[in-house]
Structure formats: structure tokens, C-alpha cells
Amino acid sequence: MARYTGPRGRRDRRAGVMLSSMRKNPLEKKPYPPGEHGRDRQRQTEYGLRLMEKQKARWYYGVSERQFRRAYEEAIRQPGVSGENLLRLMELRMDNVVYRMGFATSRPQARQLVVHGHFLLNGRKHNIPSATLKPGDVITVRDKSRRLQPIQEAVEQVVAVPAWLEADHENFTGRVLHTPSRDEIDAPVEEQLIIEFYSR
């Protein structure tokens, strides 16, 4: 499935929540879905609600349907609550961890930086953004990449790093401390509805 490259604000309006890392919230000006009939939003069916929750999670993490479905199948095989397992798998993706550590200003940018080989994983060059990391894994910005404008800007703008990660921005390195719990994940989705969508 092709990756979405259209207006992020339009998609945020469709979801009804801020999913992208845009500085301006498109919902403040137009708090209704895009399109001719956006203001006349009809009541959603239960199927529609579950579908939208799945789409919101996909859009939030910037993954294709195929990748998300594969993560769901892995999540239901793991012990514990399937919905929480799914969100953990999304959070532990290499591109998301790079973004969460503050080495990129958005997930799409983090994905591009990873693909172009600007990071080391445990001391080795790594360019697979979908790779699932684990506690103890160390991410380092390659020496020759540390002066790149996107990375410099991201490091200057970083506000806070989640408690399940640590990041040393002076030395351009970070580590996964532990697997995130649900209350350490700020994804604006109801994960149980996603599980219900796929298991229908």
C-alpha cells in the first residue's frame, strides 16, 4: 500500500484529533471533517467507529495497512492485553524510537533519516525503520550525520523524552530502558476497538 503523502491537517480533521506533529492544530479553525459534507457529519455505525480507531492508530504511527495488520497478528500471539501489546509494538519501532528520543521532529522525518542510514543500532549501521527494538538497545547518530540540519533542529526543539527511554543529546545517543506501559504511551486511540475491528 502506498504511503500517504497528502495534507496531514486534512487527515487530522478526518480523525477528529491531532495525529500529526504539525505546529498548528487544523481542528482549531475547522473542527469538522473535510469535504463538502464535513459539517453535516452523520452518526457513525459501530463498524465505522472501529474502522476509524484503526485508521487513527495507523495514521498516528505512519504505517501501512499491511504493517499494521502484521503487528496486530503478533500482538494477539503475545501474552497480556492484545491492544496494549499492539501499541507497544508500534512504540518500539525504530523510527518511532528515533522520534521519541528527539532526533527527529516527526515520524516521517525519523523514518527517512533511518532509511538513509544516519543511525547505528548497538554500534552497527541500521536502516530498517520497522525493526522492533527491545530494552537495552542503544541508538547512536552516526558521526558524519550529527551536523545534519534536521537532526540539529530536532535536538534543539526537544521538550521531553518518555520515561521508558533515555537520550543524551550532547553525545547523540539514546537507549531503550524498558518496554512502555500503557500509561507511558500517549497515542490518542482506544486500542480495544482496533482489536474488535480485526477480530470481527
UniProtKB/Swiss-Prot annotation:
Organism domain of life: Bacteria
GO biological process: ribosomal small subunit biogenesis; translation
Pfam families tied to this protein: Ribosomal_S4, S4
GO cellular component: small ribosomal subunit
Domain S4 RNA-binding positions: 92-158
Annotated segments matching region Disordered: 1-43
UniProtKB keywords: Ribonucleoprotein, Ribosomal protein, RNA-binding, rRNA-binding
PROSITE patterns: S4 (PS50889)
Molecular function in Gene Ontology: rRNA binding; structural constituent of ribosome
InterPro entries per UniProt: Ribosomal_uS4 (IPR022801), Ribosomal_uS4_bac-type (IPR005709), Ribosomal_uS4_N (IPR001912), S4_RNA-bd (IPR002942), S4_RNA-bd_sf (IPR036986)
Signal peptide: none
Listed Basic and acidic residues bias regions: 25-43
Task performed by this protein: One of the primary rRNA binding proteins, it binds directly to 16S rRNA where it nucleates assembly of the body of the 30S subunit.
UniProt record similarity statement: Belongs to the universal ribosomal protein uS4 family.
Subunit structure: Part of the 30S ribosomal subunit. Contacts protein S5. The interaction surface between S4 and S5 is involved in control of translational fidelity.
Protein name per its UniProtKB record: Small ribosomal subunit protein uS4
Species for this entry: Rubrobacter xylanophilus (strain DSM 9941 / JCM 11954 / NBRC 16129 / PRD-1)
Lineage: Bacteria, Bacillati, Actinomycetota, Rubrobacteria, Rubrobacterales
